[in-house]
């Protein structure tokens, strides 16, 4: 029979002190009336922390593990998982609720800044439902109200969990064996009175058959209101650098009244069809106000689980989830840019404009060709409505088969279907059709081509497009994607195989089969390239499978000797066979824990991990573009530099043509982009070494510090046409010696013109990343012999967590060393989100009687722009500090009420110009909303 954990699990939901789950090896008894650690293991319990399938406690592991408790979620006042995790020192913000462009309505986790595809997200040690063909988990789909704790393990764990665990693993451990009813309601609103966010959830559970079985069901509803950039002073106007160290109002040259350029002169049309000079400083279109600063969201989530102990040898279990998540992204109206034929006699034009245009019509055909720049505001904002539905089912069995051996086998299936409906797009072909006008027999202005019900389009002045014309050029778009995953897994384990005198040896054997499949069907209008508004996309369809076998071993070698209180080694190995080009893959790890005395332990680990290419990496459809690039064999130096001259000849350019404009003087090269079925796996080597202090002279105190180093090779990325050319032909820095001549095959030449054509810029195993740093955490739980509110005692809990980033070296093309950039302490066009060298999170919680008060302090160190060649108006973002305050009141047994303030001092985000991400700042890193308040209620019975 399983022990009844009901009391411990119920306690974990109450805001009565700072939870430290799986922290200490032994639980310290709490004084009367002071809440003990709600998630500390009961006597004889084993906490199965992430990083090992053999169980154990957090501080006994060779790999560093950070733990976030359910109480941390409650104290934060946040309703989405993303908003709690993004403030952890180990994570660099990724896609969040502040991500409008790009967005997609999802929230992802990004350990170490290595990318969400290199962070493996698990739920109860099993893979969870992905949201797209990149096989990334949307954190919105994880039920926050069911979370008991979150384990975050740094570094490669592929030997234990398989592909994707390069940066590490985030494992959400859910409540189990719950009996009773628990309901929560939370409402959060900004001081500005906007961005209201409501979450309500209820958990019902009960035991049956005298405790042999348990069943729970959970419902969760979230509604988040959107906030436009117009609602904040710093984001309501697009900002750009003024070239003199300051910021000025910026915008787009595609304006409401139409800008047109003929003969190098820019003019604009007024509402009456007249023209005037265009002034970018005053006439540029401010696209900022229409964009979301917080995207609206509505989510419904249901989860159910049950298990039944048939006998000691057989417990059957099942679980299922259904999630529907609806999120909108919004951009300013579509900008139309293109060369069009303007009817010089159009009645939409004033007499002065007609006269001007006739003078610019040398062939007298009645049309003038001009490049126009028009913001189609009459069509409305561009809106992407994402409706994501996902479900997951797990069916399994586990039990004791004697001799200390246990087994666990399960099958899981998950599927996500995403429907994206776009509005505000326009058809390029219909715009051109509606601009080509003539007069009918009655003297009415009509389309020259009247097919499809064409309506003449009056772009000559703001607000002049009629409703009928706007309807004619508008094109509805709907994209559909699906991603599915099947996992069949079985393992046997023995935590007491034999004893070498220092403790029981544990071992696990397992096998796993996994199949991934994805499909993306873009609207024909998008894939055909006719849409102007949102980016086009190519279809995707494909899948792969992997068969795996693994083992894990933990061996205590020595114990209770001088300076060897405990010495344990562990190892893991996994063999994987992919149906893709990756084929056979081996991953492995080894670690050691050496406790010199009870107070002091040293630990270290090495791991080889992999990230297999995703469905998207492998099967994304091909697309074509024309990036700016120059064929080096057409340059004058190709005639005089012997290295470059030889490379040109070797790649098919006749010696007589080298240094001439045989390509017509083109400054663009046709390039093919897309997925690559020949991709192999990324590999990483992770080293960690750390110290654990638990001094007996200071009960309740623990300190850990761990150094980590992660090196990724065969990094999957695109090279870029310019870098393809540099790799093949070299550059001035190396005397035009090829860096890697294998890249020359990606630059084929036309057999007749010898020009580079169809350069292949598909995904490749080409880059590399090296990062290293130190994680540290200190916790202190201090019982006090005084109290308040009717209590004679109290407790003070302190926690300081931090990361010192030493280096983050990224190179998109490992063959070209000078492309390497160290992103530690930087942000910008290459590094993206700020990589602060110091990230700290400190929480102090005081609990006495029915009252708990908690303060959270968050720190981000200063960062500098990563582009040394450009001087921006904002070259440095100063250090940022945030403070949050929460108070919880236990009104009576089973009823707790909480209130809180986030960003107490109303710290505003940094305002940037040309080197911003979006909304004139980095909204996923720095709080874009200002001071916010929340209130929550927890009821249990």
Where in this protein do the model-derived segments appear?
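N-terminal Sec signal peptide and the immediately downstream disordered periplasmic leader
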Residues: 1-78, 83-87, 201, 205, ...
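N-terminal plug
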Residues: 34-38, 48-102, 110, 128-133, ...
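Short loop/turn motifs that connect adjacent beta-strands in outer-membrane beta-barrel proteins
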Residues: 41, 177-180, 193, 209-212, ...
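Surface-exposed, low-complexity loop segments enriched in small/polar and acidic residues
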Residues: 104, 133, 225-227, 233-240, ...
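Periplasmic plug
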Residues: 108-154, 182-185, 508, 526
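Outer-membrane beta-barrel translocator/receptor signature
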Residues: 130-133, 145-148, 159-170, 176-236, ...
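C-terminal beta-signal and terminal closure region of outer-membrane beta-barrel proteins
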Residues: 421, 428-429, 607, 620, ...
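C-terminal beta-signal and adjacent terminal beta-strands/loops
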Residues: 711-713, 806-809, 857-866, 888-941
């Amino acid at each position: 029979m399983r022990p009844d954990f009901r009391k411990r699990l119920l306690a974990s939901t109450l805001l009565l002190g700072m939870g430290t789950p799986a922290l200490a090896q032994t639980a310290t008894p709490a004084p009367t009336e002071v809440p003990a650690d709600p998630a500390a293991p009961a006597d004889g319990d084993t906490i199965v922390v992430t990083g090992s399938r053999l169980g154990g406690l957090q501080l006994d592991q060779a790999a560093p593990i950070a733990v976030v408790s359910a109480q941390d979620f409650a104290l934060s006042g946040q309703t989405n998982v993303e908003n709690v995790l993004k403030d952890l020192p180990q994570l660099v913000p990724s896609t969040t609720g502040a991500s409008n462009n790009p967005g997609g309505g999802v929230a992802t986790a990004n350990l170490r800044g290595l990318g969400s595809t290199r962070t493996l997200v698990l739920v109860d040690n099993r893979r969870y439902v992905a949201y797209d063909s990149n096989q990334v988990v949307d954190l919105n789909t994880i039920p926050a109200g069911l979370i008991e704790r979150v384990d975050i393990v740094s570094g490669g764990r592929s030997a234990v969990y398989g592909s994707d665990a390069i940066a590490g693993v985030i494992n959400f451990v859910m409540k189990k064996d719950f009996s009773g009813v628990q309901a929560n309601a939370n409402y959060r609103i900004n001081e500005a009175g906007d961005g209201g966010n409501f979450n309500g959830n209820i958990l019902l559970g009960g035991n049956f058959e005298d405790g042999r079985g348990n069943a729970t069901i959970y419902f969760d509803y979230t509604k988040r209101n959107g906030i436009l950039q117009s609602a904040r002073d710093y984001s309501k106007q697009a900002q750009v650098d003024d070239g003199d160290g300051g910021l000025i109002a910026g915008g787009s040259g595609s304006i409401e009244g139409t800008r047109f350029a003929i003969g190098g002169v820019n003019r604009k049309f007024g509402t009456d069809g007249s023209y005037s000079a265009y002034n970018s400083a005053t006439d540029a279109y401010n696209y900022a106000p229409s964009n979301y600063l917080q995207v609206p969201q509505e989510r419904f989530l249901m989860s159910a689980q049950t298990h039944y102990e048939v006998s000691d040898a057989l417990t059957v279990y099942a679980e299922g989830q259904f999630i529907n998540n609806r999120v909108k992204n919004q951009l300013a109206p579509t900008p139309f840019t293109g060369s069009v034929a303007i009817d010089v006699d159009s009645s939409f034009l004033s007499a002065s404009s007609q006269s001007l245009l006739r003078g610019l019509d040398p062939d007298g055909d009645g049309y003038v060709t001009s490049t126009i720049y028009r913001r189609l505001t009459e069509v409305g904002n561009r809106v992407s409505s994402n409706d994501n539905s996902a479900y997951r089912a797990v069916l399994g069995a586990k039990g004791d088969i004697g001799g200390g051996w246990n087994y666990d086998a399960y099958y899981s299936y998950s599927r996500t279907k995403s429907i994206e409906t776009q509005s505000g797009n326009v058809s390029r072909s219909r715009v051109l059709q509606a601009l080509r006008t003539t007069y009918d027999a009655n003297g009415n202005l009509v389309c020259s081509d009247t097919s499809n019900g064409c309506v003449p389009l009056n772009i000559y002045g703001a607000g002049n497009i009629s409703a009928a014309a706007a309807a004619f050029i508008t094109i509805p778009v709907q994209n559909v994607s699906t991603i599915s995953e099947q996992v069949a897994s079985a393992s046997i384990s023995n935590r007491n195989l034999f004893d070498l005198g220092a403790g029981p040896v544990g071992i696990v054997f397992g096998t796993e089969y996994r199949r991934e499949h994805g499909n993306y069907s873009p609207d024909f209008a998008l894939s055909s390239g006719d849409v102007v508004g949102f980016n086009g996309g190519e279809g995707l369809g494909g899948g792969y499978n992997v068969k795996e076998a693994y083992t894990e071993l933990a061996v205590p070698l020595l114990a209770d000797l001088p300076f060897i209180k405990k010495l344990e080694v562990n190892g893991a190995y996994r063999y994987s066979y992919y149906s893709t080009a990756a084929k056979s893959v081996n991953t492995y790890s080894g670690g050691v824990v050496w406790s010199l005395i009870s107070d002091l332990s040293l630990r270290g680990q090495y791991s080889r991990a992999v990230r297999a290419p995703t469905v998207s990496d492998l099967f994304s459809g091909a697309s074509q573009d024309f990036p700016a690039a120059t064929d080096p064999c057409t340059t004058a130096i190709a005639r005089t530099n012997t290295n470059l001259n030889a490379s040109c000849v070797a790649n098919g350019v006749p010696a007589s043509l080298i240094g001439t404009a045989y390509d017509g003087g083109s400054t663009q090269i046709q390039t093919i982009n897309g997925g690559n079925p020949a991709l192999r796996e990324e590999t990483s080597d992770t080293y960690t070494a750390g110290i654990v202090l638990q001094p007996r002279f200071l009960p309740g105190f623990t300190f850990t510090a761990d150094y980590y180093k992660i090196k990724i090779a065969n990094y999957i990325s695109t090279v870029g046409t310019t870098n393809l050319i540099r790799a093949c032909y070299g550059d001035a820095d190396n005397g035009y010696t090829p860096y890697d001549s294998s890249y020359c095959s990606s630059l084929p030449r036309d057999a007749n013109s010898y020009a580079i054509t169809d350069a292949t810029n598909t995904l490749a195993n080409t880059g590399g990343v090296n990062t290293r740093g130190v994680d540290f955490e200190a916790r202190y739980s201090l019982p006090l012999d005084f109290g308040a509110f009717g209590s004679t005692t109290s407790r003070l809990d302190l926690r300081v967590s931090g990361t010192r980033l030493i280096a983050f070296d990224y190179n998109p093309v490992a063959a070209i060393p000078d492309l390497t950039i160290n992103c530690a302490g930087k942000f910008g066009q290459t590094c993206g989100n700020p990589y602060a060298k110091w990230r700290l999170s400190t929480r102090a919680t005081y609990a006495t009687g029915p009252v708990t008060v908690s303060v959270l302090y968050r720190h981000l160190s200063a960062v500098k722009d990563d582009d040394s060649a450009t001087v921006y108006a904002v070259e440095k973002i100063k250090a940022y500090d945030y403070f949050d305050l929460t108070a919880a009141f236990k009104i009576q047994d089973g009823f707790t009420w909480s209130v809180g303030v986030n960003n107490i001092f109303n710290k505003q985000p940094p305002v940037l110009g040309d080197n911003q991400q979006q909304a004139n700042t980095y909204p996923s890193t720095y709080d874009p909303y200002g001071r916010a308040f929340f209130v929550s209620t927890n009821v249990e019975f």
